[in-house]
Structure formats: C-alpha cells, structure tokens
C-alpha cells in the first residue's frame, strides 16, 4: 500500500523549515544507516540529536496527527522522531537500492519501534531539482514518487526502495518510520479502504443513516479485533 497525503505542511511552513535548515550544520548521512544501507547511501543529514531536528520533527508529528487521511492510512501507535536529509547534485548524492531496518531505536528517548511504514515528507518542490525520485518496488513493479513540498508518501518499510541520483539542484526531505496498531499490511489496507468508503457514503447518506451506523460499527470492531496497543 503506497499512499500520498497532500498538504501536511503549508508552503509557509516549508519556507520556514528550509530557512532554519539552511543555517544548520549537516553531517554524513551514513551516521544513521545500517551496515548494508551505508554501502549505498550518499547524502547529508541534520544530526538526529540536534535541537533543530527535534524541534522541526515535533512540528511534523503535530501536523501529521491532525490529518485525517494520514491517521486513516497509518493508524499509528508510535512514530519515530523525524530525520532530515538533503541530496545535492554537486556532491553526487543518491541512495542505492536497500530495505529499511526492521527495528529502529532512538538514543535520546529510548524509544524502540517495529518499522511497519516508512514516511518521506518532501521539503523541495519538484522543479527545484532533477533526479532524486523515490523509487519503491512492490509486487506490481517500480513506482517513482516526487511530490510537491509539504506532501508525504507512506509505504511499507519492508519495500526495496532507492533515491535516484540528483543531477541538478538540491532535494531536501524529512524521513522516518512508524509502528502501526494494525501490524498486518493487508488488514491495514482493508481498514483504510473501509474508512474511505464510509467517509464517501456518509456525505451522501448522512452519518445517522442506520446502515452507516452499522458500517461504522463494523469498522471499529475490525480495529478492535486486529489492533495491538
């Protein structure tokens, strides 16, 4: 399940983030990579324990958890503190094909999560850079993702994926992982489809329609059956 969520950050928010990040110190992105990923990772990151990364990360989490589409798709239990990276054409930055670690730990908070979903929040507009597509592989082939600044994409952390070489400009993004209350990806996908259907039908039938009430009850009972808290 690959889901795009538009407008997590406003354009003004993105501009503010970019200004703050431009004045910050960056480090080799391999500092947070696993052994296999480090061999193919070429980018820069804000230090994960920096005040800037933590402050901006809190703002992203606040914005995401107020977004109905994100909540419906992810059903988040725990969210890893957002990280920030940049890929510059003049440095030959790219990130070769890899899969994310199954478990991530945060040294500052002691948080450990199972990485069910990966998240990329774009902080550069598509016309600011060439290349830099996020390429995600699944059973149906390869999918290229390059979204407007402020939009994010959710995809299974178990997916092979890569960031193609940036050949012009600079690509800036936030990336992180989350553990969902619905561990099984098929169950999570069905819950999302059901939620989307309920939202569409409720606009035509009204939320107080008896069939809508029954359908909403089914939604909550399925979450009750599958959820891990």
UniProtKB/Swiss-Prot annotation:
Residues reported to bind Fe cation: 98, 100, 161
This protein's record includes keyword NAD: no
The name this protein goes by in its record: PKHD-type hydroxylase BRADO6316
Cofactor note: Binds 1 Fe(2+) ion per subunit.
Keyword Iron found: yes
Binding positions (2-oxoglutarate): 171
PROSITE patterns listed in its UniProt record: FE2OG_OXY (PS51471)
Highest rank taxon of the organism: Bacteria
């Amino acid at each position: 399940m690959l889901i795009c969520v538009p407008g997590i950050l406003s354009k003004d928010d993105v501009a503010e983030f970019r200004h703050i990040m431009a004045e910050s110190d960056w480090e080799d992105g391999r500092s947070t990579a696993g052994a296999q990923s480090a061999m193919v990772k070429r980018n820069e990151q804000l230090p994960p324990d920096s005040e800037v990364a933590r402050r901006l990360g809190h703002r992203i989490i606040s914005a995401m958890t107020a977004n109905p589409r994100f909540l419906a798709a992810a059903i988040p239990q725990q969210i890893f503190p957002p990280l920030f990276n940049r890929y510059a054409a003049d440095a030959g930055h790219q990130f070769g094909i890899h899969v994310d670690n199954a478990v991530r730990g945060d040294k500052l908070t002691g948080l450990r999560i199972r990485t069910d979903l990966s998240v990329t929040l774009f902080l550069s507009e598509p016309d600011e850079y060439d290349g830099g597509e996020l390429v995600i592989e699944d059973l149906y082939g390869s999918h290229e993702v390059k979204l407007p600044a402020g939009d994010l994409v959710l995809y299974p952390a178990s997916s092979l994926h890569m960031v193609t070489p940036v050949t012009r400009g600079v690509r800036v993004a936030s990336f992180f992982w989350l553990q969902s209350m619905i561990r099984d990806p098929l169950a999570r996908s069905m819950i999302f489809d059901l939620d989307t259907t309920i939202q569409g039908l409720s606009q035509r039938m009204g939320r107080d329609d008896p069939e809508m009430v029954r359908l909403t009850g089914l939604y909550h009972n399925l979450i009750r059956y599958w959820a891990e808290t």
